[in-house]
């Protein structure tokens, strides 16, 4: 059913959803902060940032143009070079998922419903309404959102990706899409993407990537930070000022590398080391990672598009001219991607095996949101791969609702105990 806005029903839906979002977020953050007991001061910035964003407290007026993105496959360097600021719309909120469900089929993925609910209820908490939403053709459900009649007044831009990434034809197609995107961005923002602006944007994002890769490296060693906290740090990149985010990740890394503090919420060095993969955990939907670490497991790495895949891979530029920088950007966003929207997708197998070796992983937890067919379809292949490698895997199908907590708790506890018995 279409709910045109503004009207009284829209006002009630929007107000109620935003209030429940604050309650959800505060509940998760209070739990995380209680577990950490303030022993890692560097995390306070990220806790506060997530809390403030959920409450809409970061949305102070400025003259910047904001462009929303719905997927990790958007080359954000081009958005910065065009004089705008990217903000990710992907949401982990159950209340926003319920708002989005007003429009979507009952079996839609929670992430897609929550993303649409966030956009529709004007809960992208940035200083000014985004001038566009960039929507790559990755997820089958997300790419149809622009066609839903909901009275939305933010224009969608469809960024076309090929269904495969290994063929020469696919790469040529994607290069063409990225070039077209760069030209269209200039029309959206009214600012030309010059060589100097694009170089500065690539270097700006590269500094953030370098800080994140250092955090990733620190997590390979003995437990110093909970995996749930590391995922939160990555999630805040969605909407934080990039320079401020990079500075605070650098400070956190220094603190962790010095070994000055240890989070009491982290299990001992003999705790089972867990790798997370599948449908991404996005704040405040930390149901699964919080449970895993509460049960005595330690999340040492993840393969989520909302955290590790968001920032790990960098742009490799040979020469700082437009003829090299744009193809280099296209390469970074296509060739490094392990999203199941691509077929074949053996790169994902190789990446998971690399994580298992580098992070000394004891077990893999594979999360699939109900309705997320892409990750569900790949689960059997990944399960067979884990069996060959003698790595136990727990497959979990869930959504944003808290109703299955009891059942999940029982299964996760049994899985952690079985991993402990193997050590």
Predicted stretch roles:
Residues 2-65, 179, 183-312, 341:
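A charged, amphipathic alpha-helical module
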Residues 16-28, 33-121, 125:
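Generic N-terminal leader/targeting and pre-domain segments
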Residues 70, 275-277, 367:
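Short hydrophobic segments within beta-strands
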Residues 72-73, 78-92, 99-100, 279-344, ...:
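Redox- and metal-dependent alpha/beta enzyme cores, enriched for Fe-S-associated oxidoreductases
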Residues 117-184:
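Acidic/His-rich segments in extracytoplasmic proteins that coordinate ligands and/or metal ions
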Residues 130, 356, 360-366:
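Proline-aspartate-enriched helix->loop->beta-strand connector
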